[in-house]
């Protein structure tokens, strides 16, 4: 996207990849949508994005010798690890910005996804301008090498790249997008770069960052090392690893896997000799792509193994076995560790790494936060659309875990099995979090389960799941939502949700409700030692509470009962289910199963007319053009959704 100029300074670019944040490294507002959104975008040429609160992140001071951009983002994720930037947009500022190369900015922006942010944007500055000028020179070289056109970029009829041109760049840098004077931010986070040391994330969490000297003392042996995927496999990353490993050999018993970020990058690394240096040292070559980072292909971690990777995620089970340990680090540390057979860093002249954590500060801007809270607390009453359940109810399960990620909900190894059934999804749901979860769900015999003999009931009754904060963080895989639905869960209650997961849920008829007070009460009563992230008091990862819970769609009342129809334990208040969410729920539950997925796109195409018409009044009529289009796509329209014919 960046190589081809689709992601460009001063524009907004969306893609169905959770790491679209990476485009922020070139001053582009890159943010993730999900695959249903992408399909709808192709059909309608429109998408939606709710503008989030903005956090100002100051990177101040000079980087010490041996410290890289990857160390910065590992430190940010590991020190500001209390959801400070969850579902926010980030603007990077500070005196440390000019010393960061564009490749380092791309790595940092890439992992703002793991940090919990929706966007991570760097300024459009002289460093970026010089980088683009070098890209234009590379295009000229490729044009010369390929006889008049740059392979993969230029058409045979033109010698000019359709997007990366000197004229377009001149306009961007002549009129850069800058913050408004007096711009207000939700908060300001500051990282003192001078206090930073090479850092390692993990094991199995990006929210745990350890200075490298500490792990070196711990003598952590490794079995596998990875320089793959989108975060740190650009030409400069490959060169950094090659400079560490050149003339050496990968340690006996260690497998070192490499894959370039793209075919263009691999050609560049081959031409420089850096690729050959890695291969000569014993590295195993994989094709460009996600590969081990998402748990696909060869080289995955096996039971009891330890791996270190230059990728962006090390969630439990993501890179192989849930019984393995995965760490994240810079390309230099990964290469040095591959040679040493344990986690170590390279010897860097003048480097004086410390075992102390970095210096940070947080400033909350109360006026902005208060305005956001006031806006959020303004309840808007929504009418109940025909066929939308007025009440969601069922027995309550509790997973006492914060940051329960999409790999935990739906393992990556199943993600690209396009023929997998809903029944199979139900069998593997939450597998990397709790292998017993699917069995528990089967025992509860939810009427909303895909294997229900008469088909899944869409009347709001099922098993309701509660969990901690930042639920669904991680990838954009849609199956994290559909697997929960398939298992018989129509609604999830959490302290907060990852935004990408929430989009997937809305598109697929899984209702998400934020109820922090309920989560704190359940944590006190059922979590081990009254704290999340260590399972329940009974030693189980998933707690079968004794409660029956009800969530009202219109009044937003959450009622906790001792049993179905029993005495009320406590009541909570949340927001009502919005009209747009109801529409999407109806489309996913009634349109898609009867008429097919193409019909959902038509349903979405006419969402504006439906929104004007959704008050349920029989005197209102659906616009004739919308009715004709909908009838053409919905042969069984009356069965699809009575909403359309009322």
Predicted features along the sequence, with ranges:
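Fe-S-dependent hydro-lyases/dehydratases of central metabolism
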Residues: 1-646
């Amino acid at each position: 996207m960046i190589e081809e100029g689709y992601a460009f300074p001063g524009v907004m670019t969306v893609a169905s990849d959770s790491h679209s944040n990476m485009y922020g490294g070139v001053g582009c507002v890159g943010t993730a949508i999900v695959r249903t959104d992408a399909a709808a975008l192709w059909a309608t040429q429109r998408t939606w994005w709710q503008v989030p609160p903005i956090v100002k992140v100051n990177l101040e001071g000079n980087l010490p010798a041996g410290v890289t951009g990857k160390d910065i983002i590992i430190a940010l994720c590991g020190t500001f690890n209390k959801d400070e930037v969850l579902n926010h947009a980030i603007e990077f500022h500070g005196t440390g910005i000019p010393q960061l190369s564009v490749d380092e900015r791309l790595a940092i922006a890439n992992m703002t996804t793991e940090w919990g942010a929706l966007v991570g944007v760097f300024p459009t500055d002289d460093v970026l301008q010089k980088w683009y000028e070098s890209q234009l020179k590379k295009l000229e070289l490729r044009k010369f090498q390929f006889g008049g056109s740059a392979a993969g970029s230029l058409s045979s009829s033109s010698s000019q790249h359709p997007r990366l041109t000197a004229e377009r760049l001149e306009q961007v840098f002549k009129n850069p997008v800058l913050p408004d004077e007096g711009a207000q931010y939700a908060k300001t986070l500051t990282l003192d770069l001078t206090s930073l040391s090479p850092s390692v994330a993990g094991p199995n969490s990006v929210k745990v960052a350890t200075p490298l000297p500490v792990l070196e003392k711990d003598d952590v042996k490794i079995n596998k090392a990875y320089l793959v995927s989108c975060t740190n496999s650009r030409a400069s990353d490959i060169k950094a690893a090659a400079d560490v490993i050149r003339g050496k050999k990968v340690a006996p018993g260690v497998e070192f896997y490499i894959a370039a970020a793209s075919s263009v990058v691999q050609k560049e690394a081959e031409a420089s000799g850096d690729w050959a240096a890695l291969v000569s040292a014993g590295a195993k070559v994989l094709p460009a792509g996600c590969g081990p980072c998402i748990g696909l292909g060869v080289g995955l971690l096996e039971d009891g193994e330890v791996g270190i990777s230059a990728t962006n995620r090390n969630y439990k089970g993501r890179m192989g076995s849930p019984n393995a340990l995965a760490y994240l680090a810079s390309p230099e540390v990964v290469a040095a560790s591959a040679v040493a057979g344990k986690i170590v860093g390279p010897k860097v002249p003048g480097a004086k790494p410390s075992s102390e954590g970095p210096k940070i500060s947080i400033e909350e801007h109360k006026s902005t936060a208060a305005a956001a809270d006031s806006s959020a607390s303004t309840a808007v009453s929504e009418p109940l659309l025909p066929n939308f359940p007025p009440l969601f109810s069922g027995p309550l399960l509790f997973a006492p875990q914060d940051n329960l990620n999409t790999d935990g909900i739906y393992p990556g190894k199943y993600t690209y099995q396009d023929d997998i059934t809903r029944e199979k999804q139900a069998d593997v749901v939450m597998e990397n979090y709790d292998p017993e979860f699917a069995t528990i769900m089967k025992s509860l015999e939810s009427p909303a389960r895909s294997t229900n003999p008469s088909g899944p009931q869409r009347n709001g009754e099922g098993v309701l799941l509660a969990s901690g904060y930042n639920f669904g963080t991680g990838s954009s895989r849609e199956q994290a939502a559909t697997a929960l639905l398939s298992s018989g869960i129509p609604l999830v209650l959490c302290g907060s949700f990852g935004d990408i997961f929430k989009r997937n849920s809305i598109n697929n008829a899984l209702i998400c409700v934020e109820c922090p007070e309920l989560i704190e009460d359940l944590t006190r009563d059922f979590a081990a030692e009254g704290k999340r992230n260590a399972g329940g008091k009974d030693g189980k990862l998933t707690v079968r509470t004794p409660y029956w819970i009800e969530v009202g769609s219109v009044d937003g009342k959450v009622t906790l009962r001792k049993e179905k129809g029993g005495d009320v334990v406590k009541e909570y208040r949340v927001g009502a289910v919005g009209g747009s969410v109801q529409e999407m729920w109806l489309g996913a539950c009634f349109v898609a199963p009867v008429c097919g997925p193409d019909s959902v796109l038509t349903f979405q195409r006419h969402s504006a007319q439906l929104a004007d018409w959704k008050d349920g009044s029989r005197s209102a009529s659906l616009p004739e053009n919308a009715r004709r289009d909908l009838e053409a796509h919905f042969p069984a329209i009356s069965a699809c959704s009575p909403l359309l014919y009322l």
